[in-house]
């Protein structure tokens, strides 16, 4: 068996309780104070349990939080790009004592985990926004969420009990499962691809370029919470299935979902996404134009430049940077400024945002934008989502 890349921090975390320990915790949880998580916190909790956020074993305490916000490092000195926190109101925090256990519920009220609260601490919203998002503007979705959440963070280790029902069950692979599948297929090098947008020709081009140098591709669309105008995850997943069916060698692709919610933290989130994919077993990670960006808050290549300031050995996963890609009418092919000599008049600009805008207007993207099979899936999915649902009486 090929030696696999080590998880971040050296050990793949597993915070799931099983057998008698789980049964005892379930019984205990019935008597514990309950804290309901929002969608992002629930996704983070699931990923902590699965080891996707290794080396984290719970929601961050004050030392880790402050160090990550200020220095992009855990208190231990280990590289880590974004805080992973549990926010509650001041009133809720006053009812919880440090050292006691609480039960954590998903947004629907289903029990997910128990947590031993090691710390309660206030935090500076402005400082977190400025350092992590590069702005304090409430028009930024990450900042807006930060300004609306509770005033106190709870830190402490968690133990997972139940995984709430979720879509795409066949694609919800844990890091241990993706690593096992990579080993089964004999992949020594694996490139991860993160996306929240509908698949288009630029994505296809980048993925195939990466497959020229790696044994396999982990196509890892994010299916957690996104902006309201982002395409529904169910529609995107059907589009990924359609393009894999007709345009990729299936034996070299593993399609799995990434449960995380989007932070829209641009450069920092690009590093965070890379570290997560390292935990899933990827040796390489694609960072394209405006990775994890939103609006005009970041420059188009800020998410690539941040890696210039990181020690490659400490990062432990190789980023693959791609320039802006387009369809060149003269070349009759996908290209980038590195491979095409023709001017702007020959270039058809491609982006997930542009495809999304056309779809919402009811327009089928041209074949230079996306494959016809994919366009059909996207159009049908959006029309079904917009169709009024009948109500039986």
From Swiss-Prot:
Transmembrane segments: none annotated. The keyword Transferase applies. Pathway: Sulfur metabolism; hydrogen sulfide biosynthesis; sulfite from sulfate: step 1/3. GO terms for biological process: hydrogen sulfide biosynthetic process; sulfate assimilation. It is an enzyme of class 2 (transferase). GO terms for molecular function: ATP binding; sulfate adenylyltransferase (ATP) activity. Keywords: ATP-binding, Nucleotide-binding, Nucleotidyltransferase, Transferase. InterPro entries: ATP-Sase_PUA-like_dom, PUA-like_sf, Rossmann-like_a/b/a_fold, SO4_adenylyltransferase_pro, Sulfurylase_cat_dom, Sulphate_adenylyltransferase. It catalyses: sulfate + ATP + H(+) = adenosine 5'-phosphosulfate + diphosphate. The keyword Transmembrane helix does not apply. Signal peptide: none annotated. Gene3D superfamilies: HUPs (3.40.50.620), Sulfate adenylyltransferase (3.10.400.10). Its EC number is 2.7.7.4. NCBIfam families: PRK04149.1, sopT. Belongs to the sulfate adenylyltransferase family. PANTHER family: PTHR43509, SULFATE ADENYLYLTRANSFERASE. This is Sulfate adenylyltransferase. The gene is sat.
